[in-house]
């Protein structure tokens, strides 16, 4: 019985620690057009990261998260080559071609490195991103956010992408975008 009393608080501590450590994305700014009254019906998801594999993993994961919430979405990589993901005219043409009313663009805006001291000193890497959501019917920006995501070196990059996508979708839901 004594072992149970000692191990229960420890188990609760571990659960809380794991829950907190899973949320590695912090949103530093978020702006939403309060006059926007619509709800996206079909979203074109564009990831402007330079690495083609990361672009595809991100877009696939984002579309999956949206579809799990019954929101129609499509990836851009199947019909937009990597170099044109930052070309506004190409994006508008692609949006029209695939029949979307909303475009979500995720792009890197920099990295930050911070030293953490403990028993040993190590560096934490943070990727800073910008998420912009456009209403294609009115051709205007309806949401813009910047985020910072902690990248642990011992965790595979696709796991970071999945966690980041969940955090972004959750934040967009909280903002009433979907």
Predicted feature locations:
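A generic structural signal for short, solvent-exposed coil/turn residues
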Residues: 11-14, 37, 65, 123
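A structural "domain/chain start" motif
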Residues: 21-80, 90-100, 174-178
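C-terminal/domain-edge helix-coil "capping" segments
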Residues: 23-42, 121-128, 132-178
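Soluble non-cytosolic domains of exported or imported proteins
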Residues: 49-60, 82-89, 128, 154-163
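Solvent-exposed loop/turn segments at secondary-structure junctions
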Residues: 50-53, 79-83, 109-113, 148-152
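Surface-exposed short loop/turn segments
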Residues: 86-140
């Amino acid at each position: 019985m004594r072992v149970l009393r000692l191990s229960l608080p420890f188990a609760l501590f571990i659960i809380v620690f794991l829950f907190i450590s899973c949320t590695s994305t912090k949103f530093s700014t978020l702006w939403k057009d309060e006059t926007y009254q619509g709800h996206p019906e079909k979203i074109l998801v564009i990831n402007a990261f330079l690495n083609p594999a990361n672009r595809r993993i991100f877009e696939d994961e984002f579309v999956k998260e949206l579809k799990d919430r019954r929101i129609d979405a499509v990836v851009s990589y199947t019909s937009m080559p990597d170099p044109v993901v930052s070309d506004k005219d190409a994006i508008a043409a692609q949006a029209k071609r695939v029949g979307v009313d909303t475009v979500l663009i995720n792009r890197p805006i920099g990295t930050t490195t911070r030293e953490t001291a403990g028993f040993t000193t190590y560096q934490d890497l943070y990727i800073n991103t910008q998420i912009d959501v456009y209403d294609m019917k009115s051709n205007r920006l309806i949401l813009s956010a910047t985020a910072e995501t902690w990248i642990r070196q011992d965790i595979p990059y696709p796991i970071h992408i999945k966690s980041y996508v969940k955090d972004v979708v959750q934040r967009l839901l909280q903002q009433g975008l979907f």
